[in-house]
Regions:
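A short helix-loop-beta-strand connector motif used in the catalytic cores of GNAT acetyltransferases and
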Residues: 37-52
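Acyl-donor (CoA/ACP) binding surface of acyl/acetyltransferases
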Residues: 1-18, 50-155
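Short, conserved alpha-helical segments within structured domains
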Residues: 26-30, 49, 118
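Secondary-structure boundary/capping residues
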Residues: 25, 44-47, 111
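Conserved GNAT-fold acetyl-CoA-binding loop/helix
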Residues: 15-37
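A short hydrophobic/aromatic micro-motif that marks alpha-helical segments and, especially, helix-coil
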Residues: 27-29, 42, 145
């Protein structure tokens, strides 16, 4: 399966639609345009900094890990593993490998992890990767007031 097809298929699972609705692509063409843009960002550290998660054994693209600039010079981590690959520790492995390297290269000293309170899988990944809770309550998430958790990781 090629990269664009894998990204598109992983993006339309129900968990992805619920937790990151702005990262759902209905067509391969949309994915190809997005991938072209993301790849163009690899030469700078302005962001977003998005990298595929590749399964070692099969070389399949099973998801992504990313850092995105948010407000006031802060950065937020994001990650998604395709539904058929979840529950195997891949997100935790990817985040643990990604954060120290990308933050050192980009000169970033802290990263936020923000998710909905009900996204227990994402909260578990952040906890396992050393994030510390700094907020739990109502705030904007995807432009809507929702109950969220904000965690922080420090290099």
């Amino acid at each position: 399966m090629d990269m664009a097809q894998a990204v598109q298929e992983n993006s339309v699972d129900e968990d992805n639609k619920r937790f990151v609705p702005d990262e759902v692509w209905e067509s391969i063409e949309e994915v190809e345009e997005t991938l072209e843009f993301l790849i163009s960002q690899y030469g700078s550290f302005e962001g977003p900094l998005v990298y595929p998660v590749i399964l070692k054994e099969t070389r399949d693209n099973i998801g992504y890990v990313q850092l995105c600039p948010i407000d006031n010079g802060n950065w937020e981590i994001g990650y998604h593993i395709g539904k058929k690959y979840t529950g195997n520790g891949y997100a935790t492995e990817a985040v643990k490998a990604f954060l120290p390297v990308i933050t050192k290269q980009a000169g970033i000293s802290e990263v936020y992890g923000i998710c909905l309170v009900e996204n227990v899988a994402s909260l578990a990944v952040m906890r396992k990767c050393g994030f510390v809770n700094v907020f739990r309550g109502i705030d904007k998430y995807q432009g809507v007031d929702r109950e969220i958790v904000k965690n922080i990781w420090k290099a």
